[in-house]
Amino acid sequence: AFYNGNQEVFRFIDVFYIMNVEKGSPWRNHLIHQYKDAITKAGFSGIHMDTYGFPKRAYSHLQEQPRLVRLDQEFCGLIDETRKGLEEAADDPCLVFNNVGNWPVGETAKSTVDAVYIEVWSPYDRYCHIKQLIQEAKYFSGNKKPVILAAYLAPFRTESDALAANAAYILTAAIVSNGGYHLLLGENNAVLTQGYYGDYSIMPDETAVVMRKYYDFMIRYLNIFYDQTLQDVSMTHIGWDNYEYQCGFQNWSVNAEAGKVWITIRENEKLKCLYLINLCGCGEDNWNKGKAEPIIQKDLTFTVNVDGDIQGIYCASPDRDSCKSESLEYSYIQNEKGKFVTFTVAELFVWTVVYLKL
Protein backbone atom coordinates (compact mmCIF):
# COMPACT_ATOMS: atom_id res chain seq x y z
CA ALA A 1 0.00 0.00 0.00
CA PHE A 2 0.89 3.69 -0.14
CA TYR A 3 1.45 5.62 3.10
CA ASN A 4 0.72 9.22 4.07
CA GLY A 5 3.09 11.68 5.73
CA ASN A 6 2.31 10.14 9.13
CA GLN A 7 3.49 6.80 7.68
CA GLU A 8 -0.02 5.43 8.01
CA VAL A 9 -1.68 3.44 5.25
CA PHE A 10 -3.80 5.50 2.85
CA ARG A 11 -7.42 4.35 2.97
CA PHE A 12 -10.35 5.23 0.75
CA ILE A 13 -13.75 5.57 2.51
CA ASP A 14 -12.28 3.35 5.26
CA VAL A 15 -12.84 0.32 3.04
CA PHE A 16 -10.03 0.17 0.49
CA TYR A 17 -6.29 0.53 0.74
CA ILE A 18 -4.68 2.76 -1.87
CA MET A 19 -2.09 0.44 -3.28
CA ASN A 20 1.49 1.12 -4.33
CA VAL A 21 1.76 1.19 -8.12
CA GLU A 22 5.33 2.45 -8.43
CA LYS A 23 7.63 0.65 -10.83
CA GLY A 24 8.88 -2.58 -9.28
CA SER A 25 5.92 -2.94 -6.93
CA PRO A 26 4.37 -6.43 -6.83
CA TRP A 27 0.94 -4.80 -6.90
CA ARG A 28 1.74 -3.07 -10.20
CA ASN A 29 2.50 -6.41 -11.83
CA HIS A 30 -0.61 -7.94 -10.28
CA LEU A 31 -2.75 -5.08 -11.57
CA ILE A 32 -1.52 -5.46 -15.14
CA HIS A 33 -2.20 -9.20 -15.04
CA GLN A 34 -5.74 -8.47 -13.84
CA TYR A 35 -6.21 -6.10 -16.76
CA LYS A 36 -5.05 -8.81 -19.16
CA ASP A 37 -7.45 -11.32 -17.59
CA ALA A 38 -10.31 -8.87 -18.10
CA ILE A 39 -9.51 -8.96 -21.81
CA THR A 40 -8.79 -12.66 -22.26
CA LYS A 41 -11.19 -14.22 -19.74
CA ALA A 42 -14.04 -11.73 -19.33
CA GLY A 43 -14.15 -10.61 -22.95
CA PHE A 44 -13.66 -6.88 -22.46
CA SER A 45 -12.42 -4.95 -25.50
CA GLY A 46 -10.44 -2.46 -23.45
CA ILE A 47 -9.52 -1.09 -20.04
CA HIS A 48 -10.53 2.10 -18.26
CA MET A 49 -7.83 2.87 -15.68
CA ASP A 50 -9.31 4.82 -12.79
CA THR A 51 -7.85 6.87 -9.94
CA TYR A 52 -9.20 8.76 -6.95
CA GLY A 53 -7.44 12.05 -7.66
CA PHE A 54 -5.95 12.02 -4.16
CA PRO A 55 -3.25 11.40 -3.09
CA LYS A 56 -0.85 12.89 -5.60
CA ARG A 57 2.19 12.09 -3.49
CA ALA A 58 2.61 9.12 -1.18
CA TYR A 59 5.28 7.18 0.66
CA SER A 60 6.47 3.78 -0.49
CA HIS A 61 7.64 1.23 2.08
CA LEU A 62 9.18 -1.16 -0.42
CA GLN A 63 12.67 -0.22 0.68
CA GLU A 64 14.30 0.01 4.10
CA GLN A 65 13.44 3.70 4.47
CA PRO A 66 10.14 5.32 3.42
CA ARG A 67 10.50 7.01 0.04
CA LEU A 68 8.27 9.79 -1.30
CA VAL A 69 6.68 8.90 -4.64
CA ARG A 70 5.15 11.40 -7.08
CA LEU A 71 2.28 9.60 -8.73
CA ASP A 72 2.28 11.87 -11.78
CA GLN A 73 5.74 10.48 -12.54
CA GLU A 74 4.56 6.89 -12.12
CA PHE A 75 1.28 6.85 -14.01
CA CYS A 76 2.73 7.15 -17.53
CA GLY A 77 4.99 4.17 -17.01
CA LEU A 78 2.08 2.19 -15.59
CA ILE A 79 -0.09 3.13 -18.56
CA ASP A 80 2.57 2.18 -21.09
CA GLU A 81 3.28 -1.14 -19.37
CA THR A 82 -0.45 -1.82 -19.33
CA ARG A 83 -0.64 -1.05 -23.04
CA LYS A 84 2.14 -3.52 -23.74
CA GLY A 85 0.44 -6.19 -21.66
CA LEU A 86 -2.93 -5.67 -23.32
CA GLU A 87 -1.43 -5.87 -26.80
CA GLU A 88 0.10 -9.20 -25.84
CA ALA A 89 -3.38 -10.39 -24.89
CA ALA A 90 -5.51 -9.06 -27.76
CA ASP A 91 -5.51 -7.25 -31.07
CA ASP A 92 -6.13 -3.50 -30.94
CA PRO A 93 -7.27 -3.18 -27.30
CA CYS A 94 -8.59 0.18 -26.12
CA LEU A 95 -6.97 1.94 -23.16
CA VAL A 96 -8.01 5.12 -21.37
CA PHE A 97 -6.94 6.67 -18.07
CA ASN A 98 -9.16 8.80 -15.85
CA ASN A 99 -7.53 12.17 -15.18
CA VAL A 100 -9.63 13.02 -12.13
CA GLY A 101 -10.06 16.78 -11.86
CA ASN A 102 -7.74 17.19 -14.87
CA TRP A 103 -4.74 15.66 -13.07
CA PRO A 104 -2.15 14.75 -14.29
CA VAL A 105 -3.24 15.34 -17.87
CA GLY A 106 -0.01 17.15 -18.77
CA GLU A 107 1.83 13.86 -18.36
CA THR A 108 -0.71 11.18 -19.22
CA ALA A 109 -1.85 12.79 -22.48
CA LYS A 110 1.59 11.96 -23.87
CA SER A 111 1.32 8.29 -22.88
CA THR A 112 -0.13 5.45 -24.96
CA VAL A 113 -3.78 6.08 -24.06
CA ASP A 114 -6.24 6.14 -26.95
CA ALA A 115 -8.00 9.28 -25.75
CA VAL A 116 -7.55 11.99 -23.15
CA TYR A 117 -10.26 11.30 -20.59
CA ILE A 118 -10.99 13.88 -17.89
CA GLU A 119 -13.49 13.62 -15.05
CA VAL A 120 -14.59 17.20 -14.40
CA TRP A 121 -14.85 18.39 -10.81
CA SER A 122 -14.68 21.69 -8.94
CA PRO A 123 -12.97 24.13 -9.23
CA TYR A 124 -13.60 23.58 -12.96
CA ASP A 125 -17.12 24.95 -12.48
CA ARG A 126 -17.72 27.40 -15.31
CA TYR A 127 -18.33 27.06 -19.03
CA CYS A 128 -15.02 28.77 -19.73
CA HIS A 129 -13.34 25.96 -17.75
CA ILE A 130 -14.90 23.41 -20.10
CA LYS A 131 -13.19 25.14 -23.00
CA GLN A 132 -9.95 25.38 -21.04
CA LEU A 133 -9.94 21.65 -20.28
CA ILE A 134 -10.41 20.71 -23.92
CA GLN A 135 -7.82 23.15 -25.22
CA GLU A 136 -5.19 22.08 -22.70
CA ALA A 137 -5.79 18.39 -23.34
CA LYS A 138 -5.42 18.92 -27.08
CA TYR A 139 -2.20 20.81 -26.52
CA PHE A 140 -0.68 18.19 -24.22
CA SER A 141 -1.54 15.37 -26.64
CA GLY A 142 -0.14 17.23 -29.62
CA ASN A 143 -3.71 17.52 -30.94
CA LYS A 144 -3.57 13.83 -31.81
CA LYS A 145 -6.13 12.28 -29.46
CA PRO A 146 -9.85 12.69 -28.82
CA VAL A 147 -10.72 14.58 -25.64
CA ILE A 148 -13.53 13.08 -23.55
CA LEU A 149 -15.06 14.96 -20.63
CA ALA A 150 -16.93 13.01 -17.98
CA ALA A 151 -18.96 16.01 -16.84
CA TYR A 152 -21.87 14.61 -14.85
CA LEU A 153 -25.02 16.72 -14.74
CA ALA A 154 -26.40 16.84 -11.21
CA PRO A 155 -29.48 18.91 -12.23
CA PHE A 156 -31.10 15.73 -13.58
CA ARG A 157 -31.04 14.49 -9.98
CA THR A 158 -31.57 17.71 -8.02
CA GLU A 159 -33.58 20.15 -10.17
CA SER A 160 -36.61 20.26 -12.44
CA ASP A 161 -36.71 18.44 -15.77
CA ALA A 162 -36.82 21.70 -17.72
CA LEU A 163 -33.83 23.27 -15.97
CA ALA A 164 -31.83 20.05 -16.31
CA ALA A 165 -32.66 19.76 -20.00
CA ASN A 166 -31.46 23.27 -20.80
CA ALA A 167 -28.24 22.62 -18.87
CA ALA A 168 -27.68 19.49 -20.97
CA TYR A 169 -28.27 21.28 -24.28
CA ILE A 170 -25.89 24.11 -23.41
CA LEU A 171 -23.17 21.83 -22.05
CA THR A 172 -23.37 19.59 -25.11
CA ALA A 173 -23.01 22.63 -27.34
CA ALA A 174 -20.06 23.88 -25.29
CA ILE A 175 -18.13 20.62 -25.41
CA VAL A 176 -18.76 19.84 -29.07
CA SER A 177 -18.12 23.40 -30.27
CA ASN A 178 -14.66 23.17 -28.76
CA GLY A 179 -13.90 19.81 -30.33
CA GLY A 180 -14.53 17.55 -27.33
CA TYR A 181 -16.74 14.56 -26.55
CA HIS A 182 -19.07 14.16 -23.57
CA LEU A 183 -19.60 11.06 -21.45
CA LEU A 184 -23.13 11.59 -20.16
CA LEU A 185 -25.80 9.35 -21.69
CA GLY A 186 -26.60 5.66 -21.29
CA GLU A 187 -29.20 3.19 -22.48
CA ASN A 188 -32.93 3.77 -22.11
CA ASN A 189 -32.66 7.52 -21.49
CA ALA A 190 -30.19 7.08 -18.63
CA VAL A 191 -28.06 10.10 -17.73
CA LEU A 192 -25.05 10.28 -15.42
CA THR A 193 -25.42 12.73 -12.56
CA GLN A 194 -22.50 11.72 -10.32
CA GLY A 195 -19.36 9.61 -10.22
CA TYR A 196 -21.13 6.43 -9.11
CA TYR A 197 -22.60 5.23 -12.40
CA GLY A 198 -25.04 2.78 -10.84
CA ASP A 199 -26.95 5.69 -9.31
CA TYR A 200 -28.09 7.34 -12.54
CA SER A 201 -31.21 9.30 -13.43
CA ILE A 202 -33.66 9.01 -16.31
CA MET A 203 -34.27 11.77 -18.82
CA PRO A 204 -37.83 12.52 -19.89
CA ASP A 205 -38.62 11.27 -23.39
CA GLU A 206 -38.93 14.79 -24.76
CA THR A 207 -35.45 15.68 -23.49
CA ALA A 208 -34.01 12.48 -24.96
CA VAL A 209 -35.47 13.36 -28.36
CA VAL A 210 -33.71 16.73 -28.34
CA MET A 211 -30.44 15.22 -27.11
CA ARG A 212 -30.59 12.67 -29.93
CA LYS A 213 -30.98 15.54 -32.36
CA TYR A 214 -27.97 17.32 -30.82
CA TYR A 215 -25.85 14.19 -31.24
CA ASP A 216 -27.08 13.76 -34.82
CA PHE A 217 -26.01 17.34 -35.41
CA MET A 218 -22.56 16.60 -34.00
CA ILE A 219 -22.14 13.61 -36.32
CA ARG A 220 -23.47 15.43 -39.36
CA TYR A 221 -20.90 18.22 -38.98
CA LEU A 222 -17.91 16.21 -37.78
CA ASN A 223 -15.61 18.14 -40.13
CA ILE A 224 -16.64 21.43 -38.54
CA PHE A 225 -16.25 20.24 -34.95
CA TYR A 226 -13.37 17.76 -35.06
CA ASP A 227 -11.06 18.74 -37.90
CA GLN A 228 -7.72 18.88 -36.11
CA THR A 229 -6.45 21.62 -38.41
CA LEU A 230 -9.03 24.08 -37.05
CA GLN A 231 -7.26 26.58 -34.82
CA ASP A 232 -9.10 28.45 -32.08
CA VAL A 233 -8.57 32.19 -32.58
CA SER A 234 -11.30 33.42 -30.24
CA MET A 235 -8.89 35.31 -27.99
CA THR A 236 -6.86 36.95 -30.75
CA HIS A 237 -9.14 37.74 -33.70
CA ILE A 238 -12.13 39.57 -32.21
CA GLY A 239 -12.57 42.57 -29.93
CA TRP A 240 -10.43 45.66 -29.31
CA ASP A 241 -8.57 46.43 -32.55
CA ASN A 242 -8.86 42.89 -33.90
CA TYR A 243 -10.84 43.46 -37.07
CA GLU A 244 -10.81 39.87 -38.32
CA TYR A 245 -14.22 39.21 -36.73
CA GLN A 246 -16.62 41.96 -35.68
CA CYS A 247 -20.04 41.80 -34.03
CA GLY A 248 -22.83 44.25 -34.77
CA PHE A 249 -24.29 43.71 -31.29
CA GLN A 250 -22.94 44.27 -27.80
CA ASN A 251 -23.95 41.26 -25.70
CA TRP A 252 -21.29 38.82 -26.87
CA SER A 253 -18.41 37.10 -25.09
CA VAL A 254 -15.62 34.67 -25.93
CA ASN A 255 -15.40 33.74 -22.23
CA ALA A 256 -18.88 32.24 -21.83
CA GLU A 257 -20.25 35.07 -19.69
CA ALA A 258 -23.80 34.67 -18.43
CA GLY A 259 -26.35 36.84 -20.22
CA LYS A 260 -24.39 36.98 -23.47
CA VAL A 261 -23.89 35.13 -26.74
CA TRP A 262 -20.86 32.90 -26.30
CA ILE A 263 -18.77 32.98 -29.48
CA THR A 264 -16.04 30.47 -30.29
CA ILE A 265 -14.06 31.07 -33.46
CA ARG A 266 -12.01 28.37 -35.19
CA GLU A 267 -10.50 28.48 -38.65
CA ASN A 268 -8.17 26.81 -41.14
CA GLU A 269 -7.25 27.43 -44.75
CA LYS A 270 -10.66 26.29 -46.03
CA LEU A 271 -13.12 27.30 -43.32
CA LYS A 272 -13.91 30.09 -40.90
CA CYS A 273 -16.31 28.82 -38.23
CA LEU A 274 -18.32 30.69 -35.62
CA TYR A 275 -19.96 28.57 -32.92
CA LEU A 276 -22.73 30.51 -31.19
CA ILE A 277 -24.17 29.44 -27.83
CA ASN A 278 -26.99 31.44 -26.28
CA LEU A 279 -26.38 32.23 -22.61
CA CYS A 280 -28.84 35.14 -22.63
CA GLY A 281 -31.25 34.58 -19.77
CA CYS A 282 -28.75 32.50 -17.81
CA GLY A 283 -28.20 34.05 -14.39
CA GLU A 284 -24.79 32.41 -13.97
CA ASP A 285 -22.25 30.40 -15.95
CA ASN A 286 -21.90 27.26 -13.81
CA TRP A 287 -22.18 24.30 -16.19
CA ASN A 288 -23.51 22.00 -13.47
CA LYS A 289 -26.55 24.06 -12.50
CA GLY A 290 -29.98 24.03 -14.11
CA LYS A 291 -30.64 26.70 -16.71
CA ALA A 292 -33.71 28.62 -17.76
CA GLU A 293 -34.59 28.48 -21.44
CA PRO A 294 -32.34 31.01 -23.21
CA ILE A 295 -33.90 34.22 -24.49
CA ILE A 296 -34.02 34.00 -28.28
CA GLN A 297 -31.61 36.40 -29.95
CA LYS A 298 -32.52 37.90 -33.32
CA ASP A 299 -30.69 39.61 -36.18
CA LEU A 300 -27.10 38.99 -35.08
CA THR A 301 -24.85 40.76 -37.56
CA PHE A 302 -21.22 39.80 -38.15
CA THR A 303 -18.43 41.20 -40.30
CA VAL A 304 -15.52 38.93 -41.17
CA ASN A 305 -12.22 39.79 -42.82
CA VAL A 306 -11.47 37.66 -45.91
CA ASP A 307 -8.50 37.50 -48.25
CA GLY A 308 -10.62 37.33 -51.41
CA ASP A 309 -13.97 36.16 -52.72
CA ILE A 310 -15.52 33.28 -50.79
CA GLN A 311 -17.64 30.32 -51.90
CA GLY A 312 -20.46 30.99 -49.48
CA ILE A 313 -21.67 31.36 -45.89
CA TYR A 314 -23.81 28.70 -44.27
CA CYS A 315 -25.74 28.35 -41.04
CA ALA A 316 -26.93 25.23 -39.21
CA SER A 317 -28.61 24.50 -35.88
CA PRO A 318 -30.05 21.45 -34.09
CA ASP A 319 -32.77 23.71 -32.69
CA ARG A 320 -34.59 23.91 -36.01
CA ASP A 321 -36.87 21.31 -37.59
CA SER A 322 -33.99 20.29 -39.84
CA CYS A 323 -30.26 20.23 -39.15
CA LYS A 324 -29.57 21.01 -42.79
CA SER A 325 -27.33 23.95 -43.57
CA GLU A 326 -28.93 27.08 -44.96
CA SER A 327 -27.12 29.52 -47.19
CA LEU A 328 -26.89 33.03 -45.74
CA GLU A 329 -26.99 36.17 -47.81
CA TYR A 330 -23.86 38.27 -47.53
CA SER A 331 -22.26 41.32 -49.06
CA TYR A 332 -18.69 42.49 -49.49
CA ILE A 333 -17.23 45.58 -47.88
CA GLN A 334 -13.92 47.12 -48.89
CA ASN A 335 -12.10 49.76 -46.88
CA GLU A 336 -8.60 50.77 -45.84
CA LYS A 337 -8.33 47.65 -43.66
CA GLY A 338 -9.08 45.21 -46.46
CA LYS A 339 -11.93 43.11 -47.74
CA PHE A 340 -14.78 41.93 -45.51
CA VAL A 341 -18.06 40.06 -45.74
CA THR A 342 -21.06 41.00 -43.64
CA PHE A 343 -24.04 38.76 -42.88
CA THR A 344 -26.86 38.32 -40.38
CA VAL A 345 -28.00 35.30 -38.37
CA ALA A 346 -31.77 35.69 -38.11
CA GLU A 347 -32.30 33.75 -34.86
CA LEU A 348 -30.27 32.04 -32.16
CA PHE A 349 -32.17 29.67 -29.89
CA VAL A 350 -29.48 27.65 -28.07
CA TRP A 351 -26.80 26.54 -30.52
CA THR A 352 -25.95 27.65 -34.04
CA VAL A 353 -22.89 27.14 -36.21
CA VAL A 354 -21.94 29.52 -39.00
CA TYR A 355 -19.21 28.54 -41.43
CA LEU A 356 -17.60 30.39 -44.28
CA LYS A 357 -16.26 28.31 -47.16
CA LEU A 358 -13.17 30.04 -48.54
List each language-model region with its residue ranges.
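Active-site-adjacent "subsite" loops/lids of carbohydrate-active enzymes
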Residues: 1-42
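Carbohydrate-binding surface patches
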Residues: 247-308, 352
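Aromatic/acidic polysaccharide-binding cleft in carbohydrate-active enzymes
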Residues: 51-55, 144-236
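Aromatic- and acidic-residue-enriched segments that line the glycan-binding/catalytic groove
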Residues: 1-12, 59-66, 113-115
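Substrate-binding cleft/loops of secretory-pathway carbohydrate-active enzymes
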Residues: 48, 55-57, 91-137, 157-176
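C-terminal beta-strand-rich structural cap/linker in extracellular carbohydrate-active enzymes
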Residues: 334-358
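Active-site and adjacent substrate-binding regions of carbohydrate-active enzymes
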Residues: 26-105, 110, 132
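Solvent-exposed beta-hairpin/edge-strand motifs
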Residues: 297-325
